[in-house]
Amino acid sequence: MVKYSREPSNLTRSAKAYGAYLRVHFKNTYETATAIKGMLVKDAKRYLNDVIDRKRCVPFRKFRGGVGRCAQAKAFKHTQGRWPEKSCKFLLDLLKNLESNAEVKGLEQSKLRLEHVQVNRAPVGRRRSYRAHGRIIPFLSHPCHVELIAVEDEDHVPRHTPTEKKVVKMNKRELARMRLRTGRALS
């Protein structure tokens, strides 16, 4: 059994999935996972498929050094973005596993929301590359561990809006500023 970094807010109405030592770039997976955090599972799957088809991009916020700009990142109020296909495929597999775990628990698929998404670094895979003049340089891979927790959304009761008009109290300065702005006196 895997130890998760945190427990879900509601144990009975949640599902978990974990991927360990995944041979996919840590930085790309981190940015992709951050992009789907808080989404409904069905929306996250649609988004990841759009990234694979290059219809939408993954905004690179933290690990953005040397990342080119793309117009699709404007949807996230950002300028830099990429389309990390391998990370998307790994996350899609984990989301599929998460849905299966939720189905076993009897949770409703359409209400699953990704509450917790975390990507951790795994130990570096070390290889070597042979260069000219007898030199040897390291050839490293940076795998990662990914954990997902989805919670079934509860039906929210709409907030009550008061019918009475609220009396706004203002001091002299605020009242004078309001008069200047509107151009008339308030009674």
Curated annotation (Swiss-Prot):
SUPFAM superfamilies: Ribosomal protein L22. GO terms for biological process: cytoplasmic translation. Keywords: Ribonucleoprotein, Ribosomal protein. GO terms for cellular component: cytosolic large ribosomal subunit. Pfam families: Ribosomal_L22 (PF00237). One of its GO terms (molecular function) is structural constituent of ribosome. InterPro entries: Ribosomal_uL22 (IPR001063), Ribosomal_uL22_euk/arc (IPR005721), Ribosomal_uL22_sf (IPR036394). Belongs to the universal ribosomal protein uL22 family. NCBIfam families: uL22_arch_euk. This is Large ribosomal subunit protein uL22. It comes from Theileria annulata.
